[in-house]
């Protein structure tokens, strides 16, 4: 061939001047001749069908009368003559007769005569065929369809003998001249052409047609000749040779060209062929010698027969080609002879004898000729490639003049059609009073051809009309009609690369001609209703509407071979925008929201063209009438929307084509599914005629060129020659499978147009009833199936015009299960033409498991044969079916039998094992993925309908496990990743209402969300509430301010929306770009940003020996700095030391990902109290760093450790100077080897502390708090098997690490925070380090607020007392004396109270005293680490800290929240190693690319810095290198990045980019402040211009201006660090305000999460081993201390918090007797340092032996929130835990307390275990045994009195309770009060909270009285002991400072986590409590325990009434009071 086929252009490009083509034809040279073809007929056939059936030559009987001459429209031919008797008449338009006239009038005898001997036997397998339309005939101008359109095996090799190869087809007149044989129109080896010729059955007996004087195997008449035995039109001839026929019938109509009569008569006749007795011979296929039944089995159905004699479904109605070819028609019922039959009988009898004589010789010569042609074909096409039908057609010695005439007529036809369209457009414009867009055509003969085309659209002559069967003998009298059909048919069907007729036009098409057929359907196929077929007949073409999609439907130029300009010689040409059949008059397509570089290569016309393809994929007949239908308008709007989405989402033009074509294909597939289901139902009754699948037939399947019921005619898939040679065949269930050709290779795609050429070969369907079903067109534009396709099909990929598809696309016809996966399309992009040789030739590896070829269409999964699928899948199915758990799944669910009428309402798509088995054997599965989908559908249905505790549900779980275990190996063996149905972990939802409340799955919840973005800063507010907490909210909603009492910024309840926590996201899929197998994206470890070339599965990669592409975005390629280098060397050194030679297997990569400077702002209360008085700094500058560690596992990087730290340098003011704070630390347990995992973590942390020590930092701080339930610190979704450590275990972990640090010298010492405060003599909050995000700043805020409230309450109380004193002084006499005495007592009491209070506070600062109580409560959680010894500290302090590492910008790693949020959005989970690998891949890519956005633009082509920006497009930029080579329709303006000195690629250097930004910011600041017009700084003038431009720019608002975008990004950088109040930089103040708002929003959420964590921690508070500084009893710190009186306890782990599982909240104390169980001391109000009242105190009441009634009440009230008066820290409200079997029903679903808690709690209470080990300086005093006994008595007494303790109270309900109280106070009548109570009772939890509030207020005075009574009964021994301890109590009780402060710990909280002011009614109790507590402290420290945390327990009214009785039986326990 002269040119590679992939570079052939299509002829449907625009063509403006037909003369250009003609002039090009004039210069063509004749093709070289071939000697072996000299005896071959080179004249064209005149069959209107375009690809007729086989022809065989048969001598005519010599005695046959010849027709008389007549003038028939330009031809006057007489029988027996080879020359016309008169010249042709001139026809309209100036053309002298038909273009074929000269060929017909001057035939070449040598070329017209058949060399086959007269007696050639017809029974050979390879019928002799010299028709110019046949593949083994002469290489004439009209090639028949390729083998892809012809049933039967390829002609490339010998064919097996047998009855499957009929020699000739009956019912077609041959073409013969003189005494020569009649030429028969046959396919290769006698194949018939089902696309063009109908199969006519023989009668039930007698000789075959033409048995007299004809060979016995004469199968019928060829195109253009009369039926033997039928009268032939006078003068009719074929190929210039006069046939000798029998008597001339009277039916021949004068005025019709005889050649057209003969040509059209047999083709357009729908009668049974030769049904009278004269034709008793059966069709050869059904003769006994062929092994067929004696009778024709389907004559009554009018069946067609294929080349194997198998029945082919024929149309029930008139079978008209979509191009108007009358090739297929249906006959009348059996037994109804045609009107010509009687006259034809006699002629057939006369021909029978001559035919018999010539039969033997004909067969012999036919065999010889077949061998010669096979050799010639092999020589031309090369070994190993199947010969295409058209490759041996045309004789290269044909007369160039004749060839030119044919070419001229073809060009004229093409031009005339285009010209007609232009005229129509001109008329349309004229109707609108608009100037015509096209000039008038001046081409000669154009009008003539337009008349011919117009006539052909409505020409019914010679075709069956159901109302007039006599039309079968009519002849068309219009000139050029038949010849034009013939030429068009040849052009359409010719697939030869060296065709002398087509090749010149191919060359012309290689140049960009303006030649197209945009709307040929409007002229011929749609508006004209091609061939006169009534619209009502519903039969525009043989196939489904899906086949017609995208092409010119029902046009003259497309029959079963599809678009002639696509399917013919121009298949390979690029498809221009105006291509074929777009919807006319579409408005310009919508511009994309973001413009990309490749967008400018796609014109609007092309986009509209593709929109039309989408429309026609759904509604294939958009005629002008339908264009006015609103449904079609909606459909077009949908198509435009889809096209726009694809246009925007695609990364390049190829992907855009790929996405659109994938969409089209899936739409077509869905349409076909419904039709095929009907076909299969209809075929069931006729299975005896179906062809079973076989290897031979399998090779005939999957033909690209073949017409299928699946493909649209324009569905953009490439065509391979060998594919065209494989016709469809087989039964309805087998015609969906493809097989590999004999050579096992994918033939090179020679079609650069990636839409397939729809061929003329239809599936051989073995039951006639299915034909009618298949022929029913689906023209409804929006039926159910179509609607589903619109909504359920994601875009997938096929290439469109201009590019060669890398995947040769076979056609699949079968029921394909709808794919439910929501995957986006793969990155399959058809390679360019230059890549065709490399990419396409290897587009499919040879599969061992499932041999198949060629590759399926894009996004259609690999297609396996039915046998292979059964072999692989049946064993899995059998195991499932035999399982005991499969009982409910074996048969379909019978809703009536099971009495479940709602089953089908809930389950929309039932599935069961029996149905799966049937579909498997019916061939309805094309791949294993569809089988898996059905199994999972079956299981999902069971899980959806049945409850979790039902047997069916559990059976489904077990069956799913079995299925995965059995199916996974099978899927892997078939080339897939796995058989699992994988979904991402559902996100945990937190309730912002009650503490520790979570929103469970499938629960309803309410959410408030608002977001605003300005200046590139986005502020998002999102608050979620469970149903119960939402109901408890007041109508005004929640406060969005930091101060919860601020009512100015509220989110009302009406702004909340109700949602359900039921969202499940499934893992997306990627498709292999070659075999289209679906892999989970995470299994494939593929991200299209990292690997833009597309995904290649391991199967194809192995077969093709492709190396996995390099990942440019590895973590190891991120920049190093000093810190990361230091840590990496240390860790790898440690691993090497431990593993020696194995260390290289476990390389660790450590990188510092972010280094930024920030400031920690002081909170409001602290600022008001201390900052304004200059006692405390307002801000603390610090540097934050993010350090992450990676390990290479299985060759892939996996991130396993993350660390965020804050460094407060030497320039930071005290108390933060030279301190480092470990803010967050997180890990996932994927590090290998496992035994070194903990040590490596320790090395990382100790390495950082050592590094900080070397820099000059002196102290480090760690908060050892596990995350709360469902919370993550750094990594999203930890592995389920990785248990989040419980508090004690985590603290032990840190302690072990720090002890190791002490040993190695990196740590000097470490203490708990309480010990550190005592040692540092902390007397004011200003001495406590103040870290960003730490726990203590919030605690200080609360302490200050509480102290202020208490002071206000005291003043109110004093004022009240003073008022009473003043009132008492008014009386006289005795009463006055009594009052005076009373006042004196009150004053003395008040003074004593104040003095005692001061004596109890050693700091003299109420806030500090409260802090100390919190310190002791949480001392186990906070570590203070000294890095530098006190001796070396002065030397260290003398040197300022200088960080050797520069700043490193990273928005994603700027704190933990950004990365965590992005991971949740993108599903970057670390829940398994598989997902961790993928998440790390995406993380590393984002880290590489994070710095390349915002500041400068990047080139859309190469991603380098862009300097050219499109003014029209939203986002299109080019660099200098790409601009010359990239065409863009808009004007480009040159821009420069505002950042000088830094390139985008320098982001890896970190510092370089930062320095560039800083220089640019400095220039910006200077320019905004500079007033010098002649400033000598160059950057000044540049920045001034930029600033001025931004102020005036109108495009700045929508973000389309590149200059403004850069400036705003630069201003954001500046604003993050700007502190000037009057900054002149544009937008600085606005951006800072927005940043502050963003920070506040983030801080509120952070406070909420911290409160949750601390509340979870406090639920197990004290469950931690003391640090070494507080352990002095010699017990190992990691060993639990047994209870006091219960003996040694089990070695159990401490409680934990934060797991998604609930076990960390399930705690119950270890058993024991009541007193022993109560040995856990109750916490004091303020924590009471020195009293051994550790953090465990809150848990005491819930111990064994408590009143069951109290337990019940507690469990009843617990859901409403925490109790009051606990710990005093935000979120420290603690709930009592029980061991009584009644778990604590917190909203989070928490259970009882873990038994492991008790030892931990007791360790935290040295007062119970080791008197000398008390913290706070108490140890050493040595409490004696009586004191301990006293403590036990007090605890016993406490157990009796614990019911008197007030119930816990949910502080979040405080505002509502206050509102209720106000309503009660305002109520004046009893009815009003009842109304209030009635409303209150509607919300039970609020009613209970109100009751508890009342009980709390009433209980405290009673308890104070009880304590006073008990104190009076104390023993002298106890008094003596208390006197001895008074001195130490004064020091040990410093943290108490007055115990009242500790009570006000539970206050109403807003979502921000802040605490509101205390209710005054609550505050009134503190003075009362303070009156009694100091005396008790002095008397009995142990007695304090009985009163500890009085608000921690619930007390009902009955228990309150029983208080005196409870106290009386235990007088001994009251000692010490």
UniProtKB/Swiss-Prot annotation:
Methylation by prmt-5 may repress the capacity of cbp-1 to enhance cep-1-dependent transcription of egl-1. Residues 21-30, 78-90, 141-151, 165-182, 340-379, 559-573, 1699-1708, 1793-1812, 1908-1932, 1963-2017 have a biased composition (Low complexity). Zn(2+) 2 binds at residues 1510, 1513, 1528, 1530. Residues 152-164 have a biased composition (Pro residues). Residues 106-116, 721-773, 1667-1678, 1748-1757, 1943-1962 have a biased composition (Polar residues). GO terms for cellular component: cytoplasm; histone acetyltransferase complex; nucleus; transcription regulator complex; transcription repressor complex. Residues 1-13, 834-854, 1349-1358 have a biased composition (Basic and acidic residues). Interacts (via N-terminus domain and HAT domain) with prmt-5; the interaction results in methylation of cbp-1. Interacts (via HAT domain) with cep-1; cep-1 transcriptional activity may be inhibited by interaction with methylated cbp-1. Component of a complex that contains prmt-5 and cbp-1. This is Protein cbp-1. The gene is cbp-1.
């Amino acid at each position: 061939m002269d040119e590679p086929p992939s570079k052939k252009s299509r002829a449907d490009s625009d063509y403006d001047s037909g003369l250009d083509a003609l002039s090009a034809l004039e210069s063509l040279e004749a093709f070289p001749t071939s000697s072996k073809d000299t005896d071959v007929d080179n004249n064209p056939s005149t069959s209107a069908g375009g690809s007729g059936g086989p022809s065989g030559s048969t001598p005519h009987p010599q005695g046959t009368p010849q027709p008389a001459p007549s003038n028939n429209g330009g031809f006057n031919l007489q029988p027996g003559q080879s020359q016309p008797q008169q010249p042709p008449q001139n026809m309209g338009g100036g053309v002298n007769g038909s273009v074929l006239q000269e060929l017909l009038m001057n035939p070449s005898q040598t070329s017209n005569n058949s060399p086959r001997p007269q007696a050639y036997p017809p029974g050979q397998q390879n019928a002799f065929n010299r028709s110019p339309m046949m593949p083994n005939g002469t290489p004439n101008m009209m090639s028949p369809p390729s083998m892809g359109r012809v049933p039967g095996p390829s002609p490339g090799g010998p064919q097996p003998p047998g009855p499957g190869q009929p020699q000739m087809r009956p019912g077609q007149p041959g073409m013969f001249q003189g005494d020569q044989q009649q030429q028969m129109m046959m396919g290769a080896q006698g194949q018939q052409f089902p696309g063009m010729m109908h199969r006519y059955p023989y009668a039930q007996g007698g000789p075959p047609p033409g048995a007299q004087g004809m060979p016995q195997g004469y199968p019928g008449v060829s195109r253009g000749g009369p039926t033997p035995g039928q009268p032939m039109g006078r003068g009719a001839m074929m190929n210039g040779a006069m046939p000798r026929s029998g008597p001339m019938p009277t039916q021949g109509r004068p005025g019709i060209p005889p050649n057209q009569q003969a040509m059209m008569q047999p083709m357009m006749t729908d009668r049974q062929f030769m049904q009278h007795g004269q034709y008793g011979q059966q069709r050869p296929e059904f003769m006994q010698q062929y092994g067929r039944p004696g009778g024709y089995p389907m004559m009554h159905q009018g069946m067609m027969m294929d080349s194997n004699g198998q029945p082919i479904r024929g149309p029930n109605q008139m079978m008209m080609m979509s191009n108007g070819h009358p090739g297929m028609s249906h006959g009348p019922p059996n037994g109804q002879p045609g009107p010509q039959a009687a006259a034809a009988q006699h002629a057939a009898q006369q021909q029978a004898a001559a035919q018999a004589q010539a039969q033997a010789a004909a067969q012999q010569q036919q065999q010889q000729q077949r061998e010669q042609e096979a050799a010639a074909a092999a020589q031309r096409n090369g070994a190993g490639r199947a010969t295409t039908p058209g490759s041996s057609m045309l004789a290269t010695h044909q007369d160039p003049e004749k060839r030119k005439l044919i070419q001229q007529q073809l060009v004229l036809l093409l031009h005339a059609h285009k010209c007609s369209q232009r005229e129509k457009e001109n008329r349309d414009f004229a109707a609108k009073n608009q100037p015509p867009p096209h000039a008038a055509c001046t081409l000669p003969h154009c009008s003539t051809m337009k008349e011919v085309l117009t006539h052909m659209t409505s020409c019914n002559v010679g075709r069956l009309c159901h109302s007039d069967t006599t039309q079968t003998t009519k002849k068309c009298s219009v000139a050029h009609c038949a010849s034009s059909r013939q030429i068009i048919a040849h052009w359409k069907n010719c697939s030869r690369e060296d065709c002398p007729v087509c090749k010149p036009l191919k060359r012309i098409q290689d140049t960009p001609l303006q030649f197209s057929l945009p709307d040929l359907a409007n002229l011929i196929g749609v508006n004209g209703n091609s061939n006169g077929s009534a619209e009502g007949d519903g039969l525009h073409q043989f196939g489904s509407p899906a086949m017609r999609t995208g092409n010119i439907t029902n046009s003259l130029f497309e029959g079963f071979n599809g678009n002639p300009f696509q399917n013919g010689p121009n298949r390979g040409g690029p498809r221009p925008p105006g291509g074929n059949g777009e919807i006319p008059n579409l408005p310009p397509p919508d511009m994309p929201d973001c413009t990309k570089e490749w967008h400018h290569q796609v014109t609007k016309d092309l986009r509209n063209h593709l929109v039309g393809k989408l429309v026609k994929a759904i509604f294939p007949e958009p005629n002008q009438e339908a264009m006015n239908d609103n449904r079609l308008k909606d459909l077009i709007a949908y198509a435009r929307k889809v096209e726009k989405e694809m246009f925007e989402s695609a990364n390049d033009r190829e992907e855009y084509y790929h996405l659109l074509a994938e969409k089209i294909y899936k739409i077509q597939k869905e349409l076909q599914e419904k039709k095929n289901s009907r076909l299969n139902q209809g075929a069931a009754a006729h299975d005896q005629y179906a062809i079973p699948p076989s290897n031979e037939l399998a090779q005939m399947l999957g033909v690209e060129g073949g017409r299928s019921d699946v493909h649209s005619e324009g569905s953009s898939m490439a065509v391979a020659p060998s594919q065209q040679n494989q016709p469809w065949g087989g039964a309805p269930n087998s015609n969906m499978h493809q097989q590999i050709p004999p050579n096992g290779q994918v033939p090179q795609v020679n079609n650069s147009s990636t839409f397939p050429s729809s061929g003329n070969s239809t599936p051989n369907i073995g039951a006639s009833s299915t034909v009618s079903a298949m022929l029913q067109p689906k023209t409804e534009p929006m039926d159910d199936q179509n609607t589903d396709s619109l909504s359920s099909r994601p875009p997938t990929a096929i290439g469109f015009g201009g590019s060669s598809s890398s995947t040769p696309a076979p056609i699949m016809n079968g029921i394909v299960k709808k794919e439910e996966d929501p995957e986006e399309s793969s990155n399959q992009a058809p390679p360019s033409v230059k890549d065709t040789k490399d990419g396409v030739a290897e587009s499919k590896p040879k599969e061992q498991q499932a041999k198949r070829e060629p590759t399926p269409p894009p996004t259609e999964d690999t297609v396996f044969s039915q046998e292979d699928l059964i072999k692989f899948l049946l064993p899995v199915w059998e195991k499932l079916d035999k399982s005991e758990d499969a009982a409910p799944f074996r048969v379909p669910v019978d809703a009536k039998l099971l009495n479940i009428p709602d089953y089908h309402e809930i389950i929309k798509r039932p599935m069961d094992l029996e149905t799966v088995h049937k579909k498997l054997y019916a061939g309805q599965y094309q791949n294993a993925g569809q089988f898996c989908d059905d199994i999972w559908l079956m299981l999902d249905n069971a899980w959806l309908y049945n409850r979790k505790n039902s047997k069916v549900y559990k059976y489904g779980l077990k069956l799913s496990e079995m299925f995965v275990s059995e199916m996974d190996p099978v899927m892997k063996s078939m080339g897939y990743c796995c058989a699992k149905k994988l979904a991402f972990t559902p996100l945990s939802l937190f309730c912002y209402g009650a503490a520790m409340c979570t929103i469970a799955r499938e629960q309803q919840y309410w959410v408030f969300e608002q977001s605003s973005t300005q200046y590139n800063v986005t502020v998002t507010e999102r608050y979620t509430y469970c149903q119960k907490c939402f109901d408890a909210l007041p109508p005004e909603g929640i406060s969005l301010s930091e101060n919860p009492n601020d009512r100015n910024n509220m989110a009302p309840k009406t702004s909340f929306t109700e949602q359900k926590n039921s969202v499940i996201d499934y893992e997306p899929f990627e498709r292999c770009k070659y075999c289209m197998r679906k892999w989970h994206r995470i299994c494939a470890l593929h991200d299209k940003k990292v690997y833009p070339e597309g995904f290649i599965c391991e199967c194809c990669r192995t077969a093709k020996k492709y190396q996995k592409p390099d990942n440019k975005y590895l973590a190891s390629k991120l920049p190093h700095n000093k810190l990361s280098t230091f840590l990496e060397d240390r860790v790898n050194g440690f691993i090497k030391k431990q593993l020696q030679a194995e260390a290289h297997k476990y390389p660790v990569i450590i990188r510092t990902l972010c280094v930024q400077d920030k400031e920690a702002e002081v909170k409001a209360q602290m600022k008001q109290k201390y900052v304004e008085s200059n006692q405390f700094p307002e801000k603390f500058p610090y540097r934050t760093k993010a350090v992450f560690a990676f390990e290479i596992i299985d060759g892939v990087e996996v991130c396993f450790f993350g660390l965020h730290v804050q460094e407060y340098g030497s320039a930071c003011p005290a108390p933060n100077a030279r301190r480092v704070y470990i803010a967050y630390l997180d890990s996932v347990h994927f590090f290998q080897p496992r035994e070194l995992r903990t040590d490596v973590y320790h090395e990382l942390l100790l390495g950082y502390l050592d590094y900080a020590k070397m820099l000059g930092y002196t102290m480090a701080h760690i908060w050892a708090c596990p995350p709360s339930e469902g919370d993550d610190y750094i990594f999203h979704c930890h592995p389920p098997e990785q248990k989040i450590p419980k508090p004690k275990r985590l603290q032990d972990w840190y302690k072990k690490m720090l002890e190791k640090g002490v040993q190695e010298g990196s740590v000097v010492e470490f203490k708990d925070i309480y010990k550190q405060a005592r040692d540092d003599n902390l007397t004011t909050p200003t001495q406590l380090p103040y870290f960003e995000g730490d726990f203590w700043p919030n605690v200080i805020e609360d302490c200050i607020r509480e102290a202020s409230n208490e002071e206000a309450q005291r003043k109110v109380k004093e004022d009240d007392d003073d008022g009473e004193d003043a009132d008492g002084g008014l009386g006289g006499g005795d009463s006055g004396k009594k009052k005076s005495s009373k006042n004196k007592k009150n004053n003395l009491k008040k003074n004593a109270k104040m003095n005692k209070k001061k004596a109890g506070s050693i700091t003299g600062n109420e806030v500090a005293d409260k802090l100390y109580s919190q310190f002791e409560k949480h001392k186990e959680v906070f570590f203070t680490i000294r890095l530098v010894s006190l001796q070396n500290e002065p030397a260290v302090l003398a040197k300022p800290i200088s960080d050797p590492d520069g700043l490193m910008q990273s928005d994603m790693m700027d704190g933990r929240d950004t990365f965590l949020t992005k991971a949740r959005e993108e599903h970057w989970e670390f829940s398994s190693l598989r997902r961790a690998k993928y998440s790390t891949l995406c993380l590393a890519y984002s880290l590489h690319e994070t710095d390349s956005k915002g500041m400068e633009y990047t080139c859309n082509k190469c991603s380098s810095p862009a300097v050219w920006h499109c003014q029209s497009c939203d986002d299109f930029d080019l660099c200098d290198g790409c601009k010359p080579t990239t065409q863009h329709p808009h004007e480009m303006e040159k821009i420069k990045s505002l950042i000088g000195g830094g390139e985008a690629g320098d982001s890896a250097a970190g510092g370089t980019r930062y320095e560039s930004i800083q220089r640019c910011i400095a220039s910006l600041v200077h320019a905004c402040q500079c007033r010098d017009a002649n400033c000598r700084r160059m950057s000044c003038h540049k920045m001034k211009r930029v600033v001025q431009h931004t102020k005036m720019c109108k495009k700045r608002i929508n973000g389309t201006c590149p200059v403004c975008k850069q400036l705003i990004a630069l201003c954001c950088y500046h604003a993050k660090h700007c502190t000037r109040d009057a900054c002149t930089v544009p937008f600085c103040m606005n951006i800072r305000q927005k940043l502050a708002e963003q920070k506040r929003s983030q801080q509120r959420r952070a406070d909420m999460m911290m409160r949750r964590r601390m509340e979870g921690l406090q639920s197990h508070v004290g469950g931690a081993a003391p640090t070494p500084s507080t352990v002095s009893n010699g017990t190992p710190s990691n060993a639990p201390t047994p209870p006091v009186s219960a003996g040694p306890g089990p070695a159990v782990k401490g409680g934990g918090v934060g797991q998604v599982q609930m076990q960390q909240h399930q705690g119950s104390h270890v058993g024991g007797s009541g007193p022993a169980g109560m040995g856990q001391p109750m916490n004091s109000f303020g924590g009471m340092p020195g009293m051994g009242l550790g953090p465990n105190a809150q848990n005491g009441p819930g111990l064994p032996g408590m009143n069951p009634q109290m337990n019940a009440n507690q469990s009843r009230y617990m859901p409403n929130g925490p109790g009051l008066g606990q710990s005093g820290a935000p979120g420290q409200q603690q709930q009592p835990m029980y061991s009584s079997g009644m778990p604590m029903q917190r909203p989070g679903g928490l259970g009882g307390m873990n038994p492991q808690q008790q030892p931990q709690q007791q360790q935290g209470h040295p007062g119970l275990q080791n008197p000398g080990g008390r913290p706070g300086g108490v140890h050493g005093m040595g409490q004696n045994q009586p004191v301990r006994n006293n403590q036990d008595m007090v605890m016993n007494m406490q157990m009796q009195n614990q019911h008197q303790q007030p119930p816990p109270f949910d502080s979040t309900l405080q505002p509502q309770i206050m509102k209720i109280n106000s309503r009660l106070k305002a109520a004046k009548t009893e009815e009003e009060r009842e109304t209030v109570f009635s409303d209150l009772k509607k919300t039970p939890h609020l009613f209970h909270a109100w009751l508890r509030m009342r009980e709390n207020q009433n209980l405290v005075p009673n308890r104070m009285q009880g304590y006073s009574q008990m104190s009076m009964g104390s023993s002298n021994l106890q008094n003596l002991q208390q006197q001895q301890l008074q001195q130490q109590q004064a020091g040990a009780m410093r943290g108490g400072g007055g115990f009242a402060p500790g009570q006000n710990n539970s206050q109403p909280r807003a979502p921000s986590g802040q605490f509101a002011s205390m209710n005054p009614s609550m505050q009134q109790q503190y003075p009362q409590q303070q009156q009694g507590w100091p005396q008790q402290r002095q008397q009995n420290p142990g007695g304090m325990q009985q009163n500890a945390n009085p608000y921690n327990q619930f007390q009902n009214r009955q228990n309150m009434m029983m208080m005196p009785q409870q106290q009386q039986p235990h007088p001994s326990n009251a000692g010490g009071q």
